[in-house]
Every structure is written in structure tokens, then in C-alpha cells.
């Protein structure tokens, strides 16, 4: 999704805000911590008065991801993450090493979750209570470990049966490459689920903040 489409989507979402107890119907959230979160997404969100949650894989801070297509995606620095937090955006964990949590032994799982949370709290000087499961994969063991590590809300991609729905908040993909992305967003807003948009390799995820 190019920046123009992202701006139009944010404009659309801002116009859909219903005020009252829920300032907006949806909160944009961003996985992986790419630099374009800081350079592009955050300024556009601020322009339209939209909130946002940025989920960071802490082992990758200041480094880069290599995508399957061979692209190098730079990850935000500590200073950038701190600045986002100071600007009023929420910071969450996307795991430490961006690995499948469901494949980890219990001890490693607990250590990875706690480490990521500790690193982020040290950077921003605030509590970090939200987690986005890497690759959207989870099971009840991962949910329990996340809760024990201090997370009170966790985001998947697709939902599922879980004892605590706050720990498996679903997200519905909407590809920005399709001409119908705005129509899909409109339908999703009426049904109040989560919408996912893509800005280059940036993953924008929108989720209702209320009644969770």
C-alpha cells in the first residue's frame, strides 16, 4: 500500500470515530517495528488524530529484517521507539527474536517474553502490557506464559477458542494492493472487527479498543 492510500484509509477511519467512551472504533497497530512505522505511519496517524500501538521484536532493535523477496527492512532504534512513546503512541512486544512462540520449550518461552517486556520498559520508562504473537501463532500454553509475563492483552491474526478473549484478539487481513481495500474496510467497520493494511512491508492492524 502506498502512502497515499494509507492516508486515505486513516482519513476514513478518523471520520468513523464515534467519540464518547471509545475515542475511535479502531486502533491501528503495527508489527515488527520497521523504520517506516516511525517515518511514515506515525506522522500520518498524528495528522488524523488516530491512536496506534507499535509492536517491537526487541532482538531486532536497530537492526534489519531480510524479507523473502530479498528486501532489507530496517528496524527502529531505541531513540525512535522512545520518541513514539513520548508522542502518545503505545509500545508493545512482538516477542524478542521474532520466533514461533508455540515451538519454544516452556522455560525459553517465559524467558523470551519477559526479556522483550523488560527491554521495552527500560526504553520507554512505562509499563508494557500488550503483546502481538509473532506470525499470529498461539496456543493455551503461550497464552498462559504471556499472562504470567505481565501481558494483559495479546493480538493474533485469526481468532480461536480461548479461555480469555483479551489474550487472543483476532485481526482480519485487508490487502492494500487490491482496489477494493476501502470497501472492505467499510464493511469491517460496520461489523467492528480488525482490519489489516499493508504499507510497503508495514503491517497495519486495526482493532476495537472497547469492551475487551
Question: Which role does the model predict for each range below?
Answer:
Residues 1-87:
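Active-site beta->alpha N-cap acidic-glycine motif
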Residues 1-29, 34-40, 103-212:
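C-terminal active-site subregion of NodB/CE4 polysaccharide deacetylases
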Residues 48-51, 87-91, 147-153:
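Glycine-enriched alpha-helix->loop->beta-strand junction motifs that scaffold or abut catalytic
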Residues 50, 54, 97-101, 121:
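Conserved SAM-binding loop
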Residues 56, 71, 96, 164-167:
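Residue-level signal for pocket-adjacent positions within structured domains
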Residues 58-60, 95-97, 137, 160:
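Active-site-proximal loop/turn and secondary-structure-junction residues that shape catalytic pockets
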Residues 76-111:
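Histidine/lysine/aspartate-rich catalytic loop segments that bind and position anionic ligands
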Amino acid at each position: 500500500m502506498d502512502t497515499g492510500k494509507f492516508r486515505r484509509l486513516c482519513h476514513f477511519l478518523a471520520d468513523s470515530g464515534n467519540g464518547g467512551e471509545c475515542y475511535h472504533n479502531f486502533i491501528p497497530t503495527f508489527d515488527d517495528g520497521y523504520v517506516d512505522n516511525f517515518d511514515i505511519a506515525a506522522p500520518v496517524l498524528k495528522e488524523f488524530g488516530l491512536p496506534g500501538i507499535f509492536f517491537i521484536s526487541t532482538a531486532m532493535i536497530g537492526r534489519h529484517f531480510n524479507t523473502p523477496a530479498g528486501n532489507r527492512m530496517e528496524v527502529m532504534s531505541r531513540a525512535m521507539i522512545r520518541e513514539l512513546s513520548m508522542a502518545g503512541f503505545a509500545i508493545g512486544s512482538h516477542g524478542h527474536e521474532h520466533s514461533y512462540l508455540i515451538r519454544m520449550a516452556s522455560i525459553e518461552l517465559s524467558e523470551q517474553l519477559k526479556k522483550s517486556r523488560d527491554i521495552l520498559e527500560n526504553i520507554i520508562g512505562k509499563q508494557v502490557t500488550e503483546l502481538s504473537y509473532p506470525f499470529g501463532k498461539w496456543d493455551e500454553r503461550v497464552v498462559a506464559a504471556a499472562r504470567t509475563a505481565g501481558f494483559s492483552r495479546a493480538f493474533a491474526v485469526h481468532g480461536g477458542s480461548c479461555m480469555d478473549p483479551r489474550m487472543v484478539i483476532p485481526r482480519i487481513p485487508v490487502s492494500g494492493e487490491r482496489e477494493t481495500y476501502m470497501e472492505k474496510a467499510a464493511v469491517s467497520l460496520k461489523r467492528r472487527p480488525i482490519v489489516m493494511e499493508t504499507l510497503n512491508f508495514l503491517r497495519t492492524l486495526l482493532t476495537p479498543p472497547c469492551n475487551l
